Amino acid sequence: MAQGTLYIVSAPSGAGKSSLIQALLKTQPLYDTQVSVSHTTRQPRPGEVHGEHYFFVNHDEFKEMISRDAFLEHAEVFGNYYGTSREAIEQVLATGVDVFLDIDWQGAQQIRQKMPHARSIFILPPSKIELDRRLRGRGQDSEEVIAKRMAQAVAEMSHYDEYDYLIVNDDFDTALTDLKTIIRAERLRMSRQKQRHDALISKLLAD
């Protein structure tokens, strides 16, 4: 069976990364593509399901996982830990399923060091004006918060050239098509096709 591919996807807040990933997943069968499920020490919110939205663990369990290098990456955010389990990712990839990991550039760097065969995609907004409009469109942040988010976005975007692919999300449907095209092209790579069609190739080349 062909090994699945891990896709690292990064973008500044407001670029449409999460919406694009969710739209992609709706067009792909579950046995082809899944999104990575992280471990966290924070308490579940209403409606969240263990193993579907997050793997909920306590601080001691999380620190034990850190001690045995169980995470591809991990970080502490507002007193809670979040991390991506190497074992959980590898188990899904071994079944031939592609996995999408929505993460910032710092986490992406950690993962590339441990899984150099992962593919990475960076998503840009079409302009600063459009990014500002999208951030304001949420209608939930003050001017100070928006300014801080914009500064963070610029810092995040400065790492765009560390990635394998670049998508500019000007038109959502076009950006989604670009994302699908990347996935299709990766699945047609010789290494994956040889594994997938091993039996056919053997028969075709038999005397």
Swiss-Prot record:
Q: Which Gene3D superfamilies match?
A: Guanylate Kinase phosphate binding domain, P-loop containing nucleotide triphosphate hydrolases
What SMART domains has UniProt attached to this entry?
GuKc
Give the catalytic activity: GMP + ATP = GDP + ADP
Its primary localisation, in coarse terms, equals cytoplasm
What residues bind ATP, as annotated? A11, P12, S13, G14, A15, G16, K17, S18
CDD domains under this entry?
GMPK
Which Pfam family, an example, fits this chain?
Guanylate_kin
Q: Where does it sit, as one GO cellular component term?
A: cytosol
Q: Which domain of life is it from?
A: Bacteria
Its EC number is 2.7.4.8
UniProt lists the family membership as follows:
Belongs to the guanylate kinase family.
Q: Which PANTHER family match?
A: GUANYLATE KINASE, GUANYLATE KINASE-RELATED
Described purpose of this protein according to its UniProt entry? Essential for recycling GMP and indirectly, cGMP.
Name of the protein: Guanylate kinase
Native source species: Shigella boydii serotype 4 (strain Sb227)
In the UniProt record, the gene name given for this protein reads gmk
